Amino acid sequence: INFDYEIEAKAFGGAGIDASGHPLPDDTLAAAKTADAILLAAIGSPQYDKAPVRPEQGLLAIRKELNLFANIRPVRIFDALRHLSPLKAERIAGVDFVVVRELTGGIYFGQHTLTENSACDINEYSASEIRRIMRKAFAIARGRNKKVTSIDKQNVLATSKLWRQIAEEVAKEYSDVTLEHQLVDSAAMVMITNPACFDVVVTENLFGDILSDESSVLPGTLGVMPSASHSESGPSLYEPIHGSAPDIAGKGIANPISMILSVAMMLRDSFGETAGAEMIEHAVNKTLTQGILTRDLGGLANTKQMTAAIIANL
């Protein structure tokens, strides 16, 4: 595996606020728009919790600016870490699925009204927004076990009625892929009682936010889960799913695996370097199997030691 790359670092989140007063500085956005891919570090700090400008606002902004409509979160459980899962071994056997979350529509981007005695949040989706996220999910399923579970609240919400209608229409374009529907409350239960039944899960922004976080509980740690966010034609963004962990800042003990696996996703999805991605994933698995674990995994390795072990196993 041999290819050239160039890394350019830009301020974002809290660093962006400190540098320019905005979590997504203009020069950072300009660089992101011209990049081949974006690797995003974890953001957030207690110092901004009550501030009018917060690091998390930069996430919503960059998703909208780059039209990152599809968030992809793989969920798998490493054999060496099965003991960390809060579920019994038989419940997590065979768990390997992907959550596909619509990321730029829905209630998070609707109109928000707050008065002293009432509040209103508008949840709106167009057919085109639903259709493109469905096609993304079906395309992913076609390369896996050919099953899509579409999650909605069709028995109550108008947006979910449209969601289910478009799902059925898109399913006709992928005759080799099976489509099933689940209501979100039922899906939340099944994700704990029988998570191995899922292959590709697709849902709207709010439901996806909740269910993807629920799925992250299955491996027993946030430290080994990567994610990607894709646009239709621009650069994709890759990031670990965990936060910035300010309580251990500067101690050098953070688990680097989520970021390393995010790099593997970047190699595969943005650069077409499938062999390189698989090498990284195999190296991570081998390292864990060897019993080299960071503190959040019950071991003693620090960040640099874990990273060095993974590199050695490449």
Residue ranges and their predicted role:
Residues 1, 116-185, 197:
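Glycine-rich phosphate/diphosphate-binding loop of Rossmann-like nucleotide-binding domains
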Residues 77-108, 124, 128, 243-277:
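Short, glycine-/small-residue-rich phosphate/pyrophosphate-handling segment
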Residues 14-17, 191-292:
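Glycine-rich phosphate/nucleotide-binding loop
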Residues 2-6, 144-152, 174-182, 272-281, ...:
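Flexible, glycine/charged-enriched surface loops at secondary-structure junctions
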Residues 18-123, 206:
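N-terminal glycine-rich phosphate/adenylate-binding segment common to multiple enzyme folds
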Residues 13, 80, 182-189:
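Short acidic loop-to-helix transition motifs that present clustered carboxylates
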Residues 2-26, 191:
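N-terminal beta-loop-helix "entrance" segment that forms/cooperates
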